[in-house]
């Protein structure tokens, strides 16, 4: 077995192992890594394992250089997760050992592996990654293992009521094609929503990079709800293998009583069923987000637990202060907030 740390990898070589692996998700796809790269202006790095010149394992990660040292995430940027993609525990161990050595030899402030919730690989990281902290996380995902009627009947009554309210109020659902004004309105509604929640908005260039890096109606759809010709809510959904990723919603608060976001979700679930997708992934939910958790549970979403495995320089982080450090490493995870 041969191991290398690369700053560039051939996309066909990467796709060959990732597309065939049960451990890969949308977030570890080559297209999404390119999407992160252009959003963050940082190139990904890879630990690659070879057997007879053929790749049999890969570990993608991003390094943010800063005045306090390197911060490494596999993977950064709004709820992404990464980890090792291989089908052999010996390869996993070898890659983790190489990563441990990299962390030790370099000026690393924090190095984080965000485990894939769907492949249960956490024992490998628990045993072999030299972590100082482990943080528990949760995502919620609908398992699409039956027909549309059965899935509908498994939703809670309040969820079905929300969808029907939009239908009764003649809300129309369309798919985005190429209208730049729709992307502009989508972003403005997202920005307004994040300001009200005191949250961090996604960068505006995400939308131009979306149409550059992905193919509409193949890699993603933007579903748009309209009332009397006016666009009142949006959701962006990505598709990759067995996964639909509910990535970004936005809505006009003046039309909130129409429950159009629920109608959009249902239409996107129906689209996912047509595509024979297995998981409709709502993504992460914080422990403090009880209302959001109950909203997702109303769709009969299943809980999937996963972990952040963190190696960090605790002494340096404590002396500088985590809030001050976070300002310099935007879109990267560094340490639990205590």
What are these regions (language model features)?
Residues 90-136:
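Non-catalytic accessory segments adjacent to catalytic cores
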């Amino acid at each position: 077995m041969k191991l290398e740390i690369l700053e560039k990898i051939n996309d066909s070589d990467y796709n060959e192992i990732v597309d065939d692996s049960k451990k890969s998700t949308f977030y570890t796809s080559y297209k999404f890594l390119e999407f992160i790269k252009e959003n963050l202006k940082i190139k990904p790095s890879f630990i690659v394992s070879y057997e007879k010149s053929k790749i049999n394992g890969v570990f993608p990660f991003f390094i943010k250089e800063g005045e306090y040292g390197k911060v490494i995430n596999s993977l950064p940027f709004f709820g992404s997760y990464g980890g090792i993609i291989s089908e052999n525990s010996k390869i996993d161990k070898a890659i983790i050992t190489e990563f441990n050595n990299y962390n030790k030899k370099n000026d690393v402030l924090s190095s984080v592996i965000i485990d894939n919730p769907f492949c249960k690989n956490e024992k490998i990281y628990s045993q072999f990654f030299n972590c100082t902290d482990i943080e528990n996380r949760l995502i919620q995902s609908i398992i699409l293992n039956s027909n549309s009627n059965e899935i509908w009947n498994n939703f809670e009554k309040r969820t079905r009521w929300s969808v029907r309210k939009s239908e009764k109020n003649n809300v129309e659902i369309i798919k985005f094609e190429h209208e730049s004004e729709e992307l502009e309105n989508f972003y403005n509604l997202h920005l307004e929503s994040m300001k009200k929640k005191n949250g961090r908005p996604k960068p505006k260039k995400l939308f131009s990079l979306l149409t550059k890096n992905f193919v509409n109606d193949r890699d993603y759809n933007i579903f748009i709800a309209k009332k009397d010709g006016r666009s009142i809510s949006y959701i962006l959904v990505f598709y990759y293998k067995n996964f639909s990723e509910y990535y970004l919603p936005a809505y006009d608060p003046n039309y909130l009583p129409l429950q159009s976001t629920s109608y959009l979700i249902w239409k996107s679930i129906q689209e996912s069923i047509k595509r024979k997708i297995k998981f409709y992934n709502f993504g992460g939910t914080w422990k403090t987000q009880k209302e959001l958790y109950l909203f997702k549970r109303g769709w009969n979403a299943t809980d999937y637990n996963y972990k952040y495995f963190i190696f960090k320089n605790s002494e340096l982080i404590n002396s500088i202060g985590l809030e001050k450090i976070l300002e310099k490493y935007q879109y990267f995870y560094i340490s639990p907030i205590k």
